Amino acid sequence: MGCAQPHPFHWEDLRARPREEVLSLPGVTALPEGAAYQVGFLNALYLVDPQEERIEETSPWPRRPLSKEFQILLIRYLLAPHGGKLTGELVSEKDFPGGSTFFQGPHAMPVDPVVRRYGAAAQAFVARGLELGAEQMALGDVSLTFYPFPLIPVTYVLWEGDEEFPPSVTCLFDRSVSKWFEFDMIFTLVLVLTERIVEAGAAGATTDPRHTGGAKQSQREHS
């Protein structure tokens, strides 16, 4: 189920891209009928139909509302050049040429909701990350690497607050992310990922009982 819809030009671009190029992207498969694709994002699966201009979650929570930003992110992934293998080099957004200029002010990494939700609850953050298929890392007080797409990991490093410093979260990326996405989509990727991380833990949130990771896939493709 969608909310606000992507602009028609996003769909036009996707319809114009050769189908074999789209299907070469990790985590993307063809559905047996029509021209739709199945795309994995974290532990969920989505139908993306460029002919009907429709995106739906098929598993585990088909009734999940999908933001405009999320829908654009999926389409832009399907339009992205193949960024190749992971380099294994972790970098911050400001390590990219021009990153220090772009990723500030309104484009600072949108991680504040994670800080508010988990700044004093590191183990709850770990538990939530594991629900989404994340891997624990040995950085900060706790850190988790999420795989929104198979070859585009995002690592959240959480430092719990103390008497001297407030809690904080930073993001790290494999250097190859810049071969997949421009800066605006790296920002959108973190925005969407942050929303998904805090989603289940939001006060008063209503979650579908099927939203338990039943669609979790092994998407750790490194070639």
Where do the protein language model's features map onto the residues?
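Short Lys/Arg-enriched alpha/beta "domain-start" segment
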Residues: 1-35, 70, 77-132
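Surface-exposed peri-terminal alpha-helical interaction modules
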Residues: 3, 9-21, 146-147, 201-205, ...
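N-terminal domain-start signal
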Residues: 16-61
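Intrinsically disordered, low-complexity regulatory segments enriched in Ser/Thr/Pro
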Residues: 44-72, 159-184
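Short, hydrophobic/amphipathic alpha-helical patches that form generic packing surfaces
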Residues: 68-82, 188-196
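Domain-length accessory/inserted modules outside core catalytic folds
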Residues: 100-111, 139-140, 178-181, 194
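Conserved binding-pocket/active-site segment within a compact domain
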Residues: 120-179
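Alpha-helical oligomerization segments
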Residues: 163-223
